[in-house]
């Protein structure tokens, strides 16, 4: 070993001794800053080495492989091979393997070869392994032979070669997992005890990852690492113990509502008290870590002190467990992307069909749509293909005034209804689960964006109807098309606007057919009997499992009504009134269920969407500046009788 390499080896050894020392003492010495500078220098040097400290480099290079690996969906290679082995030991007539089984066998081996080839190209240590080269060459040879000779002997040869190949691969995967655990522990210690800027930590991780582009975000790196780990774990499964998972509904019920009676830090302390830190068999109780993981991933709100306590808990008790490396990645993402609320992953609460009784819709809206013969043809919309409104909605959310030509209602009602539906659906799907219960405490949420779009649409319907009285029939056809598309939010905005006093006092002439349609659409969103008709309609849509945009303000109103109308604690004051929060969680579960379906078979023109949003913004600005505008325009049309 050269003097330079020996110096680096001593430095690394000193670093690990130092880590162990300060972890035991729980105190920091005065040379902490120098120590982290030394870590930076050592890690930078490691990038230049080919043979020395290869485990650290292998941990990273073996995981950040080509993104093509993520596109290969393999169920479980070992299970596939085992099934093939069992099936081929059964007697077959003439010793011929059925074509379907043979094709499945070829596909499984091909996917195994493709996946491992991606890793081999990116990982020098794997590339230099003669055992892997020999095992791969033998498997490749037997696989080619399988195409020409489809007898049982050829199949068993491939099975045997595949198992040998997997056996050679397994130690490398174990090394990746072990090295990654060490890497994560060091990063966690750096975050906990290093008095450094978070951007410096990000740059350090990117340096270790071998990324030249420092714009490559840390959370993307960690997500990529975890994706590859999951992939390799499926490809080469190891026998890990299964941890107990809390009920999805019970977890959501607690994590959605606990802030009504306690704080984030108080909840964490209660959870940590429930964790058996003295018991050596801590792995037998995984309910607490699992609940914390769900909390961090799906129900988190800004609380940096609590997040540091969770990181400390992970570092002290969970770092040695492979299944909790994802929790570490989640914590780091929240450290870097500081946001009031950030849903890293959706945990579905679950709602059974039995909880919502199926019934016939009070209004057969599909037949009603056919009766009024709405024209559904629009060549421009169909030619535009898949519609991506994300950039347009981002500009709209930022309050940018979209510079467009004046939007005239010359598009078909069907085309306008599709545009409204896709805009409303995009916003509704972006609502994070926790927003449904915490909306009343925060501003600038996605729910606020949904309300803003509804208000802008209401103002636009009101203005265009007052200025051009003949458009009332047009808007009724748009409303009917929205109902047919199950966009109940836009339907409510349009029908409510058309019932505004400023319009009704004009006594606009309307044909009998349109008036009949107006009366039938009014019933759907009428508040009579607590919106009975609307609720029966949405339940029918729920069971149809079709995409839908619900009347969002009614969802929030229901949650607010339950929260404000019921006591948080029981009458004796000793227990939390869980019946109240069960009702809230069921409403959120219902709202979340409706987010699982997307509109994939309808499209709209981006030009139409941009023009519509621009026109609605301009009109709504007029109504914000003058709250009496609608009445003033109405008076100008038909003066009051004196």
From Swiss-Prot:
InterPro entries documented for this protein: Ras-like_GEF (IPR008937), Ras-like_Gua-exchang_fac_N (IPR000651), Ras_G-nucl-exch_fac_CS (IPR019804), Ras_GEF_dom_sf (IPR023578), RASGEF_cat_dom (IPR001895), RASGEF_cat_dom_sf (IPR036964)
Keywords (A to Z) from UniProt: Cytoplasm, Guanine-nucleotide releasing factor
Cellular component aspect of the GO annotation: cell cortex; cellular bud neck; incipient cellular bud site; plasma membrane
Coiled-coil region list: none
GO biological process, one term: Ras protein signal transduction
Domain Ras-GEF: start-end pairs: 412-640
Pfam families, sorted: RasGEF (PF00617)
Keyword Endoplasmic reticulum part of the UniProt annotation: no
Compartments (UniProt record): Bud neck; Cytoplasm, Cell cortex
GO terms assigned for molecular function: guanyl-nucleotide exchange factor activity
Source domain of life: Eukaryota
Domain N-terminal Ras-GEF as annotated: residue spans: 224-339
Main localization of the protein described in the UniProt heading: other
Function: GDP-GTP exchange factor (GEF) for the small GTPase BUD1/RSR1. Regulates the activity of BUD1 together with BUD2 which is a GTPase-activating protein (GAP) of BUD1. Required to produce both the axial and bipolar patterns of bud site selection. Determines the orientation of division axis. Overexpression can suppress mutations in PRP20 which is the GEF for GSP1. May be a cytoplasmic GEF for GSP1. Might also act on the Ras-like protein CDC42. Appears to bind to Ras proteins but not to activate them.
SUBUNIT field: Interacts with AXL2, BEM1, GSP1 and in haploid cells with AXL1.
Other information: Present with 2110 molecules/cell in log phase SD medium.
Protein name: Bud site selection protein 5
Species the sequence originates in: Saccharomyces cerevisiae (strain ATCC 204508 / S288c)
Gene name per UniProt: BUD5
């Amino acid at each position: 070993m050269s003097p330079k390499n020996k110096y680096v080896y001593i430095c690394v050894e000193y670093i690990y001794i130092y880590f162990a020392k300060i972890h035991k003492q729980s105190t920091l010495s005065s040379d902490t800053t120098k120590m982290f500078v030394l870590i930076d220098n050592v890690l930078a040097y490691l990038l230049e080495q080919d043979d020395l400290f290869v485990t650290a480099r292998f941990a990273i290079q073996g995981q950040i492989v080509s993104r093509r690996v993520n596109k290969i969906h393999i169920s479980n290679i070992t299970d596939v091979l085992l099934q093939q082995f069992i099936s081929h030991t059964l007697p077959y007539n003439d010793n011929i393997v059925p074509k379907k089984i043979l094709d499945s066998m070829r596909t499984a081996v091909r996917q195994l070869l493709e996946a491992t080839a991606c890793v081999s190209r990116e990982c020098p240590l794997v590339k230099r392994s003669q055992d892997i080269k020999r095992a791969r060459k033998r498997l490749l040879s037997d696989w080619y032979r399988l195409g020409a000779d489809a007898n049982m002997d050829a199949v068993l040869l491939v099975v045997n070669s595949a198992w040998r190949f997997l056996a050679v691969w397994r130690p490398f995967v174990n090394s990746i997992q072990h090295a990654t655990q060490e890497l994560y522990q060091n990063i966690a210690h750096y975050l906990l005890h290093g008095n450094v800027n978070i951007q410096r930590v990000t740059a350090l991780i990117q340096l270790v990852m071998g990324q030249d582009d420092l714009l490559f975000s840390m959370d993307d790196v960690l997500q990529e690492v975890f994706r590859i780990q999951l992939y390799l774990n499926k490809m080469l499964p190891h026998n890990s113990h299964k941890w107990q998972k809390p009920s999805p509904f019970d977890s959501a019920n607690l994590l959605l509502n606990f802030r009504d009676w306690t704080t984030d830090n108080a909840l964490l302390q209660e959870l940590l008290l429930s964790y058996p830190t003295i018991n050596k068999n801590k792995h037998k109780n995984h309910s607490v870590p699992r609940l914390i993981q769900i909390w961090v991933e799906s129900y988190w709100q800004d609380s940096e002190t609590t997040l540091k306590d969770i990181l400390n808990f992970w570092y002290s008790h969970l770092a040695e467990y492979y299944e909790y490396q994802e929790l570490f990645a989640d914590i780091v993402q929240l450290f870097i992307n500081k946001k009031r609320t950030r849903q890293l992953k959706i945990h579905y609460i679950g709602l059974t069909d039995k909880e919502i009784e199926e019934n016939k819709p009070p209004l057969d809206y599909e037949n009603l749509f056919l009766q009024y013969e709405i024209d559904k043809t629009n060549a421009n919309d169909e030619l535009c293909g898949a519609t991506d409104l994300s950039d347009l909605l981002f500009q709209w959310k930022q309050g940018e005034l979209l510079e467009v030509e004046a939007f005239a209602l010359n598009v078909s009602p069907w085309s306008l209804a599709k545009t409204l539906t896709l805009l409303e659906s995009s916003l509704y799907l972006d609502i994070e689960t926790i927003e449904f219960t915490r909306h009343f405490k925060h501003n600038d949420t996605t729910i606020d964006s949904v309300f803003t779009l509804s208000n802008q649409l209401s103002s636009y319907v009101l203005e265009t109807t007052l200025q051009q009285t003949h458009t009332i029939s047009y808007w009724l056809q748009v409303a009917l098309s929205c109902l047919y598309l199950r966009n109940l939010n836009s339907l409510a905005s349009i029908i409510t606007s058309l019932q505004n006093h400023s319009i009704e006092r004009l006594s606009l002439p309307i044909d009998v057919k349109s008036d009949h349609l107006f009366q039938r659409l009014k019933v759907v969103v009428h508040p009579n009997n607590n919106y009975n008709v609307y609720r029966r309609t949405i339940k029918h849509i729920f069971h149809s499992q079709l995409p839908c945009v619900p009347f969002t303000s009614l969802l929030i109103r229901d949650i607010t009504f339950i929260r404000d109308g019921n006591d948080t604690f029981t009458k004796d004051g000793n227990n939390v009134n869980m019946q109240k929060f069960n009702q809230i969680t069921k409403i959120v579960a219902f709202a979340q269920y409706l987010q699982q379906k997307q509109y994939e078979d309808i499209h709209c023109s981006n030009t139409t969407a941009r023009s519509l949003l621009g026109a609605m913004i301009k009109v709504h600005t007029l109504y914000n500046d003058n709250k009496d505008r609608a009445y003033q325009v109405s008076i100008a049309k038909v003066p009051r009788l004196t």
